[in-house]
């Protein structure tokens, strides 16, 4: 992915549903010195405790994912504060305008709109098209999930996305480098 032009790597560390492990993040970070272009890594997990933030920093992550839907505002505060104290960026994940409003109360670095409904797992790119325009200019806007083609990427950029978080499409693609280039040039 680095050779194909990725700007960042999202590494799943959640064990129960996504079969990732913290050691996967550690391995990716440790392997990077051999790469021609090392990349920052996001710890992608259900962050529910500040201890997980410290684990992420210790493992070499540069950013954590905070899924707004899964946390109360009171639970977000110590996780976000711990990330800032550890020098990590935060990507707040939202799915609708109400979650965006909650995320913005915490002054996030980045906000990603998940096009996958976490209740039904259905994907609809119109979620990002609807939510991204409500984000302030100061926030880095990310479109997440369901981006499979250059047309999808162009659609997300037209909605105002600065970045795309693409996982499943690249994992299933026989030529992920070609897909990445197509998404980047859309």
Model-flagged regions — what are they?
Residues 2-36, 42-43, 49-55, 63:
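Acidic/glycine-rich phosphate/pyrophosphate-binding loops and surrounding catalytic core
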Residues 3-23, 103-132:
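Glycine/Thr-rich beta-alpha phosphate-binding loop at enzyme active sites
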Residues 5-8, 31-35, 58-64, 84-88, ...:
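Glycine-enriched alpha-helix->loop->beta-strand junction motifs that scaffold or abut catalytic
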Residues 7-13, 55-75, 113-121, 159-180:
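Glycine-rich phosphate-binding active-site loops on the catalytic face of alpha/beta enzymes
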Residues 15-19, 48-50, 69-73, 97-101, ...:
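Short, small-residue-enriched loops and turns at beta-alpha junctions
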Residues 19-42, 46, 68-69, 75-93, ...:
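Alpha-helix-loop-beta-strand connector modules within alpha/beta enzyme cores
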Residues 48-60, 95-107, 143, 147-166, ...:
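Catalytic cores of alpha/beta
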Residues 110-166:
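Catalytic-face loop-and-helix region of soluble metabolic enzyme cores
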């Amino acid at each position: 992915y680095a050779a194909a032009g990725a700007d960042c790597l999202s590494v799943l560390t959640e064990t129960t549903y996504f079969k990732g492990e913290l050691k996967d993040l550690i391995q990716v970070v440790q392997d990077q010195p051999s790469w021609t272009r090392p990349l920052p890594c996001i710890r992608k997990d259900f962050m529910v405790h500040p201890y997980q933030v410290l684990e992420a920093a210790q493992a070499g992550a540069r950013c954590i994912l905070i899924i707004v839907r899964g946390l109360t505002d009171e639970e977000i505060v110590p996780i976000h504060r711990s990330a800032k104290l550890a020098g990590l960026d935060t990507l707040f994940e939202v799915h609708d305008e109400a979650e965006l409003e909650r995320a913005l109360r915490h002054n996030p670095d980045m906000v990603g709109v998940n096009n996958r409904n976490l209740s039904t797992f259905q994907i609809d790119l119109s979620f990002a098209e609807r939510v991204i325009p409500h984000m302030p200019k100061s926030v880095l806007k990310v479109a997440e999930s369901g981006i499979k083609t250059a047309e999808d990427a162009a659609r997300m950029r037209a909605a105002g996305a600065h970045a795309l978080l693409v996982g499943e499409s690249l994992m299933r693609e026989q030529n992920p480098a070609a897909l990445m280039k197509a998404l980047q040039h859309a």
